[in-house]
């Protein structure tokens, strides 16, 4: 099955606590990575967690470790793709289209916004 959300897409968090209560619901961000085996996506600026790493030394002799804030993956069902034309979250459908390349006809799936009906 073709992926409904891909790397580089703009998505919006649709579940969880509201932003005014410290959550991420309603926030938008760009997809940095898609984990297909666990059905999770890494979204820029969303689901930020504090990670404590042990202090050590790198090969150059500099100190490593400390407290850093990184993004954690979020389940793909908790985000919705943002329609580029309306800037609102939408469901994604597919449309089959035949493309002729070098004399060979090939059927490709094109992602379509369910709300506006336009190609994504």
Swiss-Prot record:
Keywords noted in UniProt: Ribonucleoprotein, Ribosomal protein, RNA-binding, rRNA-binding
Membrane spanning residue stretches: none
InterPro entries: Rib_uL2_dom2, Ribosomal_uL24, Ribosomal_uL24_KOW, Translation_prot_SH3-like_sf
Complex formation: Part of the 50S ribosomal subunit.
Any one GO biological process: translation
Protein name: Large ribosomal subunit protein uL24
Function: One of two assembly initiator proteins, it binds directly to the 5'-end of the 23S rRNA, where it nucleates assembly of the 50S subunit.
